[in-house]
Every structure is written in C-alpha cells, then in structure tokens.
A protein has these predicted regions:
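Active-site cofactor/substrate anionic-group-binding motifs, chiefly glycine-
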Residues: 37, 42-90
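Positively charged, low-complexity intrinsically disordered leader regions
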Residues: 1-51
Length: 251
C-alpha cells in the first residue's frame, strides 16, 4: 500500500513518476479519483496546501471531506486507534496536516489506507515535490543545480534534503540559524534575502519561498516582488503537484 509520509518513503522511480503525473495533469484532464472519498484533517492553519488539495481532488473527480481536528473526540476521551480505524471505514485516502509527526505515525498505523502528509513538524513532502517540479519546469532539469537555503532549519528543508538523493551533481548549501528560540528573530535577521544577496547569484538564478513570507524580515519586498522571484509560480504548482501525488496513490 502506498503512503507519502516522507520523501524517503519513495524510491527514485516513484518520485519521478509523481513529477511526470503532475506535468501530464497540468495540461490534460483525468478522473482517477472517481467515487473516492478523501478526508482532509488540518490541525494547523493552511491556505495553499488546503486549497490545492481541495481543488485538485475536485478536478480529479473525487470527493473531499473536511474533518475538523478540534471537533474530534481525540481532545476528550477517544483514542487515536479508534478514531482512525473508524475513519478507514468511510474514507479511501487521508490527507493529514499536524503539529506532531508522531500523530501522523499513529494515523498510518491505524488508518491502514493511503495517507498523505500535508505537513508535520519534521517533514513537508508535498512542498518539496512542488518545489522540485517548479525547479525542473524553470531549468529543464533538477540535476547540476546549486541550491542555497537561507533561514531557519524546518520541515521543508528536511524534505528537500531527502530529494537530493534523486539528483545528479546537485549541491545544497545551508545558511541557517541554530534555532535558538530565545533570540530567534534577531539571529534570523542575519539571513535575510535582499538585493545584496541576490546580486552575487547567477544571472539565471531564482528566488523561491513556500509562503507565507515575513516580508521585511525573511526577505525584502524588492526581492519577493522582483524579476527573479517565482513564488507565485511555485504556489500555483502546488495544485499540479498534489494532483500528481493523488494520481500516484490511485494506481
């Protein structure tokens, strides 16, 4: 049974299939989710991930059911085992966004049907797939790229680092804080992406951000609104990436 909890759950062939499915579904209509019910549980707030899954499921002719985490009896007396086993009686897939990866692992243990990690505290495979799709779309390949990560170490970075195993001669440099919570904002200000930083990059370089961005803190407005910024394309590609993932699960 297929699941997507982490990028490391995939082999290179599966990863490339998802990218190919995403590319195909960007230009043609398919209905692999006909008569399928997909539950969406979002413990954390979401704009791009939620909407891209909802629209993607609709476009693939599936049904999505929003399950409010705060309304589940998990907060009172019902166990994760009972909750997810019951959900598996009604749903075909589960898309789960959570504050704690351990909750995702419990869902995987008890739901016993395909699960997609829509973000946890240590992993964001959907974002990584979308980002790599965007890089491939922009450069024609994901091989032989120099990728620099600026800012805090987070779930997106951890997932992107796992993707490097599927590339050839791609180098990743990480310029990041050590995540000292006490002085985090002060420390991270040293890693702001601004015109000075972008001026030393290659002529064909691009700026990406998973959004939402703290403009004026993480990145200047000149950069995120500038010619090298492809953040809107990156956000748009969340839709085709989610569709590629969903099709991969369906076959």
């Amino acid at each position: 049974m297929k699941n997507l909890l982490n990028i490391s759950d995939l082999n290179q062939n599966e990863f490339e299939k998802i990218l190919q499915f995403a590319e195909d579904l960007d230009s043609k209509t398919e209905q692999p989710l006909t008569n399928k019910n997909i539950g969406l549980i979002f413990e954390k707030n979401s704009t791009r991930t939620r909407l891209s899954f909802q629209v993607g499921i609709n476009q693939l002719n599936g049904n999505f059911i929003d399950v409010r985490f705060e309304e589940l009896n998990l907060n009172r007396f019902e166990s994760y085992e009972d909750t997810f086993e019951v959900m598996s009686c009604y749903l075909d897939y589960l898309v789960f966004r959570t504050t704690d990866h351990k909750k995702l692992e419990l869902a995987y243990k008890y739901f016993k049907k395909p699960i997609i990690n829509a973000l946890s505290d240590i992993s964001h495979p959907c974002q990584a797939i979308s980002d790599i799709y965007t890089l491939k779309e922009n450069f024609g390949t994901i091989d032989n790229l120099n990728i620099v990560w600026m800012g805090d170490m987070n779930n997106v970075l951890f997932s992107l680092l796992e993707v490097v195993d599927f590339t050839k001669n791609t180098k990743v440099d990480v310029f990041t804080s050590m995540n000292d919570k006490k002085d985090k904002e002060k420390i991270l200000s040293k890693f702001q992406v601004n015109d000075k930083i972008m001026s030393v990059t290659d002529e064909k370089s691009v700026f990406m951000h998973c959004l939402p961005a703290k403009v004026g803190s993480e990145v200047t407005e000149d950069v995120i609104k500038g010619k090298k910024s492809i953040v809107l394309t990156q956000a748009k590609n969340r839709l085709v990436a989610q569709k590629g993932i969903l099709k991969w699960l369906s076959i």
